[in-house]
Amino acid sequence: MFPMVTGFMSYGQQTIRAARYIGQSFIITLSHTNRLPITIHYPYEKSITSERFRGRIHFEFDKCIACEVCVRVCPIDLPLVDWRFEKDIKRKQLLNYSIDFGVCIFCGNCVEYCPTNCLSMTEEYELSTYDRHELNYNQIALSRLPISIMGDYTIQTIRNSTQSKIDEEKSWNSRTITDY
């Protein structure tokens, strides 16, 4: 009779333990009902990128000295740099610079080691196309700023607000106070 009682007690303990686990899981599930959704509706809402986000590379043709440091530090030797040596000025002249973003791993080494800071990472991450050859950007395509930066409402608002402050200061300084 004694083993039968211990069997019922262990069965009862297992039942209570299972009910406790189910109750804890149910509480966790119900706690998520008050939270806002984490996902966003992508085409209509854009996610805000972090400060250190590594997106498409921006290239400034005038700053580049054709030193090819970016090619040497790239793990896949990706940037293609074409240049010629100008004997009259004794310097390299950059002819063409291109990066294939279909192959690029966005490691950021080229940006980090560039001595003239002619390369920078943008926040642009929408690089999808139907043709992989469209991902090969030359110096003209690389020099374009992303649309998000050019058409950003906050940047325009900041520009306008600083301009209006300057105009207010000019008008305030130009006033003369006369006592009657």
Curated annotation (Swiss-Prot):
Residues 55-84, 95-124 form the 4Fe-4S ferredoxin-type domain. It catalyses: a plastoquinone + NADH + (n+1) H(+)(in) = a plastoquinol + NAD(+) + n H(+)(out); a plastoquinone + NADPH + (n+1) H(+)(in) = a plastoquinol + NADP(+) + n H(+)(out). Gene3D superfamilies: 3.30.70.3270. [4Fe-4S] cluster 2 binds at residues 74, 104, 107, 110. GO terms for molecular function: 4 iron, 4 sulfur cluster binding; iron ion binding; NADH dehydrogenase (ubiquinone) activity; quinone binding. Disulfide bonds: none annotated. One of its GO terms (biological process) is photosynthesis, light reaction. Its EC number is 7.1.1.-. NDH shuttles electrons from NAD(P)H:plastoquinone, via FMN and iron-sulfur (Fe-S) centers, to quinones in the photosynthetic chain and possibly in a chloroplast respiratory chain. The immediate electron acceptor for the enzyme in this species is believed to be plastoquinone. Couples the redox reaction to proton translocation, and thus conserves the redox energy in a proton gradient. Binds 2 [4Fe-4S] clusters per subunit. PROSITE patterns: 4FE4S_FER_1 (PS00198), 4FE4S_FER_2 (PS51379). [4Fe-4S] cluster 1 binds at residues 64, 67, 70, 114. It is an enzyme of class 7 (translocase). It comes from the Eukaryota. It is a peripheral membrane protein. Belongs to the complex I 23 kDa subunit family. This is NAD(P)H-quinone oxidoreductase subunit I, chloroplastic. It comes from Oryza sativa subsp. indica (Rice). It is found in: Plastid, Chloroplast thylakoid membrane. Its cofactor is [4Fe-4S] cluster. The keyword Manganese does not apply.
